């Protein structure tokens, strides 16, 4: 008889955002007259920028003509998009990342879950607490996290790096050396980030100890302070210890379009084995390439018109974050974030748990937040 992957049975409950969606749907069904403000997932509300729409229309027209039709895309991405990414996101910031070190995908979420496939099953991971749940869940599925303590909401084989108000949401270097270190900066969910000299410390630590940093830079477009790096490759030595994940969802509103990319430098090796070559092999086996239409839309992100339009969109979302943070602070809540990321991290009042405050917000203000416990133990008293 066939057997299942028992590691899936270790996953506690349902995925955080699926649970939120079910609770909101039930509330909406019971209260059809209520207008709900949905802040429970990092989705966008503004339409795609005109430059992107124009690129989509043009690409669709090409697909309707036999002479310009495109079938399967190159599995690693079209050269026109990879070059645009290299020139604008990296070389423009002094980062020596070439187009062929960029792997185009259907989004950062899938890449952040899949990247762990490059590493052995006995590799140990280190994550911040709170943490984006995909990093942990994907390693649970791979059998890498040990046993789960439901009371503490922790895994026995995961190294946790607390990020709290007491340390300014800047985790300390782990005393126990991990094989893989997950960093999301600017951070989801706390909205905080590191300055370049702080990030350099992590790069030096990884190189010294033979660790790999999985660096999620999905929110880099929201950085407003000059001394905060947009890429880990702005740090010396990062190409020998870091993989970077990027998304078009946050900077360009592609949540319903789906596009992202991962950077795996050729210098990143385990002994004589190239992780760049491994990821290329994995990508070619498991992915048929992002659609031509979508990649042309991605290229438009880097056009002059696209840059200007998206700058305005980012400003719109950051103004929303500022408004929310200011209002909550004036109402007496303790809040963080909202400077280099569109996230506000709120301390729940009156010793309420995050799910209790989630229900309170939904039932009394018709507002959907995200319970902090979904991001880890430290998030129990936050949304």
Regions found by a protein language model. Name each.
Residues 342-352, 366-382:
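Conserved PLP-binding active-site segment of the aspartate aminotransferase-like
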Residues 2-106, 301-305:
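N-terminal small-domain helix-loop-helix segment of the aminotransferase-like
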Residues 140, 151, 234-315, 322, ...:
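Conserved core segment of the aminotransferase class I/II
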Residues 127, 215, 369-371:
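Hydrophobic residues in well-ordered beta-strands that form the structural core
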